[in-house]
A protein has these predicted regions:
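Short, functional N-terminal and low-complexity linear motifs
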Residues: 20-26, 104-106, 120-121, 162-163
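A generic structural signal for solvent-exposed, polar alpha-helical segments
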Residues: 10, 49-50, 73, 162-167
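Hydrophobic alpha-helical transmembrane segments and adjacent short intramembrane/lumenal linkers
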Residues: 136-244
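Selected alpha-helical membrane-embedding segments in polytopic membrane proteins
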Residues: 36-147
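Terminal intrinsically disordered, low-complexity, charge-rich regions
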Residues: 1-50, 56, 60
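Alpha-helical multipass membrane-protein architecture
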Residues: 12-13, 19-20, 58-61, 83-94, ...
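A generic structural signal for ordered alpha-helices
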Residues: 9, 18-22, 29-33, 37, ...
Length: 245
């Protein structure tokens, strides 16, 4: 009782509380700087209509005409308001489906064990991390003034799992020939999708009469766009070919 009535103790308690609050705020700011939790929520702001339309664009981009992103007050709108906006819902669901589908395939081939799913998940995540790091490095070397956010890069890189899942499913139902036909279609579709979306991120300054960048910088960005798109079929083949015998 005497301790709590002591002014010095009360002052120390208040100072400690204020220090804890300031430390927590500083830590939250530090975490938010590198891992913007609030911003991540926007990438999951989807609805059924968006998911349906996005899957159509991913699987048949040839009929999609307008690839421009929509903005409101200088900020991109949530995915559910713009089919061209990147999201993390579809890549996440596609990735989880890919892992479960791998388990199903291993089960039908009498190769299933719990460790197999863990190994498959680690392998896929490792390749995704490497891809994201390489794209980030490429964007840095291309000297982009407005580089893409990490969640955005993860979203675009993760869309490939939609095509992978459908290609493996075709292999299960139609055999290896069906797998390669489906993989060819999905790969071509994803190449076009990546070129159309990446050019809006990587080549925005090339439409401004070349004042903002040199010819060599513009060529580097064009090569980067093509390279990102061209490597996708190889990754899709690598991540799925062993699942179809």
């Amino acid at each position: 009782q005497e301790l709590w009535s002591d002014p010095l103790a009360d002052m120390a308690l208040k100072y400690g509380s204020n220090l804890a609050v300031r430390s927590r705020e500083a830590m939250d700011r530090g975490i938010s700087k590198y891992f913007p939790i609030d911003k991540l929520k926007c990438y999951f702001a989807v609805d059924t209509v968006y998911v349906q339309n996005k899957l159509k664009v991913l699987l048949c981009p040839y009929t999609h005409k307008n690839w421009d992103l929509r903005f409101q007050k200088g900020e991109p709108v949530a995915p559910k308001f713009d089919v061209n906006a990147p999201d993390l819902y579809i890549p996440t669901m596609a990735f989880l489906t890919y892992v479960l589908e791998a388990g199903l395939v291993y089960g039908t081939q009498d190769r299933f064990c719990p460790d197999v799913l863990w190994t498959r998940t680690n392998m896929a995540l490792t390749w995704l991390l490497v891809e994201v790091l390489l794209i980030t490095l490429g964007l840095y070397l291309a000297a982009l003034r407005m580089p893409m956010d990490i969640p955005e890069i993860v979203a675009y890189a993760g869309y490939k799992y939609v095509g992978i899942v459908l290609s493996v499913l075709a292999g299960l139902l139609l055999g290896r020939c069906g797998y390669y036909v489906a993989l060819l279609w999905n790969s071509c579709a994803f190449i076009l999708f990546m070129i159309q979306t990446m050019r809006l991120k990587i080549l925005p300054d090339m439409d401004v009469a070349g004042r903002a960048q040199s010819v060599s910088a513009g060529r580097l960005r064009m090569y980067l766009t093509v390279a990102i798109a061209a490597v996708q079929p190889l990754l899709m083949l690598w991540l799925s070919s062993d699942l179809v015998l």
